[in-house]
Amino acid sequence: MRRFERKQNIFRNKDALGESYQPERIEERDEEIEEYMNALQPVIDGWEPNNIFLYGNTGVGKTAVTDYLLDRLQDDVAAYDDIDLSIISLNCKTLNSSYQVAVELVNELRPSGGEISTTGYPQQTVFKKLYQELEAIGGTILIVLDEVDSIGDRDELLYELPRARANGNLDSAKVGVIGISNDFKFRDQLDPRVQDTLCERELQFPPYDATELKNILESRVEVAVTDGSTDTGVLQLCAALAARDSGSARQALDLLRLGGEIAENREAEMIKEGHIEDARSQLEQERVEEGMRELTTHGRLALLAVISKAAKEETPCRTRDLYEEYRSLCESSETDALGQRSLHNHLSDLRMLGILSAHENRSGSRGNYYNYELDVPFTSAIEAMSDVLHLTTEIDTIRDIAAMNNVG
């Protein structure tokens, strides 16, 4: 067995390619930063803060810019004796209701040992406890709710919190809410009253294009990678792959980081395009497998139905076209099939996980409908399914059909 030894031939500071790294300067977001600073200006002026809503795909800089500007804001308010600023940040990814968010905020504000139970209180009682904690802090309070779309349509807190002072629930505390969402449709699903308050100032973060991603990578490489350790075309390839997929800086950085790790493990002297291609395949496989862990049996069967249609070159296709395929797979797995509406819900979940893409068709005589297809490589999807479903015969048949049609 070999010994653990340091590998330092490629990376100078690999952490600079990680999600937690905060660069000294945010690249390619000058317009968004300027607009964001204008929205935060009332804090410095001593007025009640704006409620701000940010939306855009994962990895386009929403959270990074927020952290960057709020750090700067806290530094700058130190020059003013009449401003007392507190910032509370909460990631809502695992929280699916206003009640859960309110409990987490209360417990974030209370000292260790003083937390409240996550169940057992009426919702308004929890809200009241939250107002008491906010009033105890006083001054200006910015509450950042990242991935706020996780709470779905149970959005009462998003209505109550921005209006707390106007409704007499707060006296001295001036609260502003910053909501960050990866879901473009979340805003439209909010109660109109919530839209009026939470979306006082809206900032959209568009996907990065390949040129912007290459510039971001170049700035990080200066910190993260040793001189001469990236072959010509590597950064351009990372940028092009990420731009073609989602426009995510996180994806581009992950490709470079993993490509560097693959190069080091193979004792290469520099990162080459082949390492990036291998990194892409590995990340795509991990993405599908991660999504699989969140799926129920019916979610997996719904996905296998789409994979089967893809093997036959029959995608994109509608829910009703997938339903017979799904029912057949349920029969093979001795599982009771759900109704067509429930299948539609599982397909929507797969879309949210980034495993499927959906194209809206507005020409239907009975209203709009979606056509679904894989948003991950066919090979990655079928391999992941073979690990989680005991349908060897059916999956082998799908593979054979795909091979006949040169799919994957």
Curated annotation (Swiss-Prot):
Pfam annotation, one family: Cdc6_C
Domain of life: Archaea
Family membership: Belongs to the CDC6/cdc18 family.
The name this protein goes by in its record: ORC1-type DNA replication protein 15
NCBIfam families: orc1/cdc6 family replication initiation protein
UniProt source species: Haloarcula marismortui (strain ATCC 43049 / DSM 3752 / JCM 8966 / VKM B-1809) (Halobacterium marismortui)
Gene3D superfamilies attached to this UniProt entry: 1.10.8.60, P-loop containing nucleotide triphosphate hydrolases (3.40.50.300), Winged helix-like DNA-binding domain superfamily/Winged helix DNA-binding domain (1.10.10.10)
Gene (UniProt): cdc6o
Single Gene Ontology BP annotation: DNA replication
Keyword Nucleus annotated: no
Binding site for ATP: V60, G61, K62, T63, A64, Y208, R220
Function: Involved in regulation of DNA replication.
Molecular-function GO terms, alphabetical: ATP binding; ATP hydrolysis activity
Keywords (A to Z) from UniProt: ATP-binding, DNA replication, Nucleotide-binding, Plasmid
